[in-house]
Amino acid sequence: MRRVILTTGGTGGHIFPALAVAEEITRRYPKARILFLGGQYGPEADLAARAGLEYVGLPVRGVMGRGLRALAAAGAMGLGVWRAVSVVRRFDPDIAVGFGGYAAFAGVLAARLCGRPAAIHEQNAIPGLTNRLLGHVVQRVFLSLPDTTGVFPARRCVPTGNPVRTAIVAAGAAGAAGAAEKGGVSRSAHSRRLLVMGGSLGARAINEAVVAALPALRDAGVELWHQTGVADWERVRAGYKQAGISEARVEAFIDDVASAYTWADLVLCRAGATSVAELAVAGKPSVLVPFPFATHNHQLHNARHVADAGAALVVEQKDVSPGADGRPAVALDRVLVELLADRERLADMGRAARAMGRPQAAAAVVDGMEAILAGRGARGVR
């Protein structure tokens, strides 16, 4: 395997699995060149650069809405495919793999138009439009969840799990070893550490609910590490200051998420497929607030799957947002404080999360890529 294109964009839920696969390719093929093909408008350029990957941005946007906006987005997609074809011809990849999102449509379609083998990875039980379309033109469809197989041609589907970055896998393994030594509890019974994450772009509803809960969290001695997203960073920092909390780590984006998971006793976050996969590999109990406007409400599906396994509590966004009387239906502060105080329950939830983890998912995807290339008499050698 000499050259590989990984293509996706939009949110961390698509991007981070691609970065995990890039790590595994580099581990097996240290001399391989990996090109990350993304969009010009999302966070993928910065994240790829931090991972040390070559990057090309395409002028593509999601096809949303109607009328002129949809027409403009479709035109941009056409231009994106044309440019992606140029990139594929110049880079000459052995294989291209898409991870969903609008950029992946252009990248994978360009690879197939140029006669290159390609695959996609689907993180969710209910695929988005990009992967639904591409699933009929690629050699393999790698699935996080086996029950997604009915959407794609069965002969092309390979259940792999959702790839998680190496540092998180290592942190999860270390946490499991530490918990085993201490009978399932990984740190002091007095620890009250809450990690708040709204996804790679932040989550205003979660940010606002946590700021409202700060007085109770402060009084209960809860330590906080809070990823706010860029848009809400100053507003949330002001909320912490007003609550008299100066020791909390309040960051727009957490670069070292593996350390954040290791630090935390409990995680409050969205229920995107990649977040759920990371929580499982890290063995972390969670309170999940699904994004209610996700396509086909797939985050609620993800959250209930984790909750049914005993690894999470689910609180819907409408229940933590103020109602007509100005009060939320669910007192999030009480939920968090009571759960953080129950060490035995946290340990049980952590074990349940770890049992769901697929730490070898990235390796399974690269195995599948190798199988595609072996079937074509691939040029690259390890």
UniProtKB/Swiss-Prot annotation:
GO BP field: carbohydrate metabolic process; cell division; cell wall organization; lipid glycosylation; peptidoglycan biosynthetic process; regulation of cell shape
Q: What residues does UDP-N-acetyl-alpha-D-glucosamine bind to?
A: 11-13, 124, 165, 200, 254, 299
User: Has keyword Iron-sulfur?
Assistant: no
Give the EC number(s) listed in the UniProt record: 2.4.1.227
Keyword set, alphabetical order? Cell cycle, Cell division, Cell inner membrane, Cell membrane, Cell shape, Cell wall biogenesis/degradation, Glycosyltransferase, Membrane, Peptidoglycan synthesis, Transferase
The answer to keyword Signal applying to this record is no
The UniProt entry, under CDD domains, shows: GT28_MurG
Going by the entry's taxonomy, the superkingdom of the source organism is recorded as Bacteria
Membrane spanning stretches:
none
Q: Where in the cell is it found?
A: Cell inner membrane
Q: In which pathway does it act?
A: Cell wall biogenesis; peptidoglycan biosynthesis
Could you state one GO cellular component term attached to this entry? plasma membrane
Please state the protein's primary subcellular location.
membrane
Q: Select a single GO molecular function from the record's annotations and give it.
A: undecaprenyldiphospho-muramoylpentapeptide beta-N-acetylglucosaminyltransferase activity
How does the protein associate with the membrane?
A: Peripheral membrane protein
According to UniProt, the reaction catalysed is: di-trans,octa-cis-undecaprenyl diphospho-N-acetyl-alpha-D-muramoyl-L-alanyl-D-glutamyl-meso-2,6-diaminopimeloyl-D-alanyl-D-alanine + UDP-N-acetyl-alpha-D-glucosamine = di-trans,octa-cis-undecaprenyl diphospho-[N-acetyl-alpha-D-glucosaminyl-(1->4)]-N-acetyl-alpha-D-muramoyl-L-alanyl-D-glutamyl-meso-2,6-diaminopimeloyl-D-alanyl-D-alanine + UDP + H(+)
Give the Pfam families listed for this entry.
Answer: Glyco_tran_28_C, Glyco_transf_28
Q: What InterPro entries does UniProt report for this protein, alphabetically?
A: GlcNAc_MurG (IPR006009), Glyco_trans_28_C (IPR007235), GlycoTrans_28_N (IPR004276)
Functional description taken from the UniProt entry:
Cell wall formation. Catalyzes the transfer of a GlcNAc subunit on undecaprenyl-pyrophosphoryl-MurNAc-pentapeptide (lipid intermediate I) to form undecaprenyl-pyrophosphoryl-MurNAc-(pentapeptide)GlcNAc (lipid intermediate II).
Under NCBIfam families, the record lists: murG
Q: Which family does it belong to?
A: Belongs to the glycosyltransferase 28 family. MurG subfamily.
Report what the protein is called: UDP-N-acetylglucosamine--N-acetylmuramyl-(pentapeptide) pyrophosphoryl-undecaprenol N-acetylglucosamine transferase
Provide the species name: Nitratidesulfovibrio vulgaris (strain DSM 19637 / Miyazaki F) (Desulfovibrio vulgaris)
